[in-house]
Swiss-Prot record:
One of its GO terms (molecular function) is RNA binding. Pfam families: EIF3I. It comes from Brugia malayi. Belongs to the eIF-3 subunit I family. This is Eukaryotic translation initiation factor 3 subunit I. InterPro entries: eIF3i, WD40/YVTN_repeat-like_dom_sf, WD40_repeat_dom_sf, WD40_rpt. Keywords: Cytoplasm, Initiation factor, Protein biosynthesis, Repeat, WD repeat. Its main location: cytoplasm. Component of the eukaryotic translation initiation factor 3 (eIF-3) complex. GO terms for biological process: formation of cytoplasmic translation initiation complex. Disulfide bonds: none annotated.
Length: 327
């Protein structure tokens, strides 16, 4: 199928998200306005204007009522999805690097970077508590991190948050139990973790790392179950909601791209079998590394965002949907 190529950002993409209904696509980049698009035809509905810096991460609630963004302008904003109005702005000590909305859509978890006297931290805010969101009261949960975390995700409903840090470790915190780590895997990756995503049923967690691998973990115990090897650093990985497949995206780092040909940069998205760890398909299209990937909830298409500033919606053809792996 011919992919849709969407141009709405002046600079590199940092995150694409699809709502649970699968009809809206949200994208954020290193420019200051996240965009929202129709998945069906790639028409841009509008932008969320209010930030003054790079948008590092975004997330959307299950009912598509709320949308949140983490930015380098030291603000985390909660938006009304439909109108594009800012509901709350939370001031952060340093730039916010990653953000995740909980299963219920009531709690926001985000991580901040280490800068000068400020240590990297994990925060959890309750969006129902106006005094918390306005900064009058302390957040629901706060934890100083020894190593900066570039990704965070809710793992068990509204109870536990996982962070992936620059040393390649995965740590899990239970917000009901104070600031102790519940689970950890300090041998998850050799280099920094760039992205973490959950499976639809919340039983698996996939991580993408600079060490040229993506790994599948048990979301409860953080045991490593599978390793998917690539030839270049992996920036993003996602699990198919309907098949035993995972998709990896990455490529040669942006600053090294001038020294490589497009073919050796490995700028394709790669499909692997979840169980057998074998690559069986690739998508070309981006002329730079892929920074972010998301599967459609129906499992029939995948969205990628690249360093080239384009969002691509790649629909799977019937060959893929009928494809069965030979044992």
């Amino acid at each position: 199928m011919k992919p849709l190529s969407l141009k709405g950002h002046d600079r590199a993409l940092t995150r694409v998200r699809i709502n649970r209904d699968g009809d809206l696509l949200f994208s954020a980049g290193k420019d200051k306005s996240p965009c929202v698009w129709y998945m069906e035809n790639g028409e841009r509905i509008g932008t969320y204007d209010g930030h003054n810096g790079v948008i590092w991460d975004i997330d959307v609630s299950w009912d598509t009522r709320h949308f949140c963004s983490a930015s380098g302008d030291v603000f985390v904003k909660l938006w009304n999805c439909e109108t594009g109005d800012v509901i709350n702005s939370v001031s952060t000590p340093t730039a916010a690097r990653s953000i995740s909305l909980s299963y219920s859509g009531n709690l926001i978890a985000f991580t901040t970077i280490k800068m000068t006297q400020n240590v990297a931290s994990l925060f959890v805010y309750d969006i129902r508590d106006g005094s918390q969101m306005s900064g009058e009261n302390q957040p629901t949960f706060r934890k100083s991190l020894q190593t900066q975390a570039n990704s965070c995700v809710w793992t068990h409903l509204d109870d536990t948050v996982c962070v992936g840090n620059e040393k390649g470790n995965v740590h899990q915190y239970d917000i009901r139990k104070g600031d102790d780590i519940v689970n950890f895997n300090d041998e998850a990756h050799k280099f920094q973790i760039n992205d973490m995503q959950m499976s639809t049923d919340e039983s698996f967690l996939i991580t993408a790392s600079k060490d040229k691998t993506a790994r599948l973990f048990d979301a409860r115990t953080l045991d490593c179950l599978k390793t998917y090897k690539a030839e270049r650093p992996v920036n993003s990985a996602a699990i198919s909601p309907i098949r035993d497949h995972v998709i990896l995206g990455g490529g040669e780092e942006a600053m090294k791209v001038t020294q490589t040909t497009a073919a050796s940069g490995h700028f394709e998205a790669k499909l692997y079998h979840l169980v057998f760890e074998e690559e069986f398909a690739r998508f070309k299209g981006h002329f730079g590394p892929i920074n972010t990937l998301a599967f459609h909830p129906g499992g029939n298409c995948v969205v990628s965002g690249g360093e080239d500033g384009y969002v691509r919606i790649q629909e799977f053809d019937t060959d893929y949907l009928k494809f069965d792996y030979d044992f």
